[in-house]
C-alpha cells in the first residue's frame, strides 16, 4: 500500500508539472477557450484597407494605418511570385498583379527590375498581440473564374479565411499571424491555386469539429 501511494504521488507531481508548464496565453483579447479548440486561437479582424479599419475602430486609426503599411511590406516579401505577368494574371485575374520591387530581403538573382510578378494585396488581417500592440498579415484574393481563391481572402501560404468582405472578425490559430518565410523563387502557373485547394480540403476536414464543440 505504501508503494502504491508513492506511485500515485509521483503521477500527481508529473501531471501538476505538465499543467504548470502549459501556455498561459489563453485569453488574448476576445479569445474563446473552447473544449477541443487550439489553446493559441485568437480573434482577428479582416479589412481591405486602413480606412475600413479606422471606420470600424475610430480610436485605433493610427494602429490601423501602421498595421496596413506593415502588411504591405510583408506582402512584397511573402506573396507568391511568378516569372511573367501572364502567369500571375491566370491565377489572380486582370488588374490584380504588379511587378515585384527589388528589395534587400530577396536573393540577388531575383532583384532584376521587373523579373517577377506578384498579386496585389487585397486586404489584411489584424490582431492584438499579448505583449501589446498589433500584429498583421497580408491577404490576397483572385478574380480568376477557375481559381479556388476567387472571392476569398487567402494568405501567402494559401490558407483560406472566407469571403473577401471587409470588416469581418473571426477566430484563427495564432500561427496565422506568425511571420511567413520570404518567397524568392517563382512558381508555375496554377501552383498557388493547387496550394489553396489543398488548404481548403484540410480546412473542411478539420474545422467542423472545432465549430461544433462548445457551441
From Swiss-Prot:
Please give the InterPro entries that the UniProt record associates with this protein: Biofilm_formation_YgiB (IPR009576)
Pfam families linked to this entry: DUF1190 (PF06693)
| Protein family according to the UniProt entry | Belongs to the UPF0441 family.
Q: What is this protein called?
A: UPF0441 protein SG0265
Query: Which organism's genome codes for this protein?
Result: Sodalis glossinidius (strain morsitans)
Taxonomic lineage of the native organism:
Bacteria, Pseudomonadati, Pseudomonadota, Gammaproteobacteria, Enterobacterales
Amino acid at each position: 500500500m505504501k508503494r502504491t501511494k508513492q506511485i500515485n504521488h509521483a503521477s500527481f507531481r508529473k501531471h501538476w508539472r505538465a499543467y504548470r508548464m502549459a501556455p498561459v496565453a489563453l485569453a488574448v483579447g476576445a479569445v474563446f477557450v473552447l473544449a477541443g479548440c487550439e489553446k493559441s486561437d485568437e480573434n482577428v479582424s479582416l479589412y481591405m484597407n486602413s480606412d475600413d479599419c479606422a471606420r470600424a475602430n475610430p480610436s485605433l486609426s493610427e494602429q490601423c494605418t501602421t498595421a496596413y503599411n506593415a502588411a504591405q511590406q510583408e506582402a512584397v516579401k511573402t506573396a507568391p511570385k511568378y516569372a511573367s505577368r501572364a502567369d500571375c494574371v491566370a491565377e489572380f485575374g486582370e488588374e490584380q498583379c504588379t511587378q515585384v520591387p527589388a528589395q534587400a530581403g530577396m536573393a540577388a538573382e531575383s532583384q532584376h527590375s521587373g523579373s517577377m510578378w506578384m498579386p496585389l494585396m487585397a486586404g489584411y488581417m489584424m490582431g492584438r498581440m499579448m505583449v501589446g500592440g498589433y500584429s498583421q498579415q497580408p491577404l490576397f484574393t483572385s478574380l480568376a473564374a477557375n481559381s479556388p481563391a476567387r472571392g476569398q481572402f487567402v494568405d501567402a501560404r494559401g490558407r483560406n479565411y472566407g469571403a473577401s468582405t471587409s470588416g469581418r472578425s473571426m477566430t484563427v490559430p495564432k500561427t496565422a499571424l506568425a511571420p511567413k518565410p520570404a518567397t524568392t523563387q517563382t512558381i508555375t502557373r496554377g501552383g498557388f491555386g493547387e496550394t489553396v485547394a489543398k488548404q481548403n480540403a484540410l480546412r473542411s476536414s478539420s474545422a467542423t469539429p472545432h465549430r461544433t464543440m462548445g457551441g
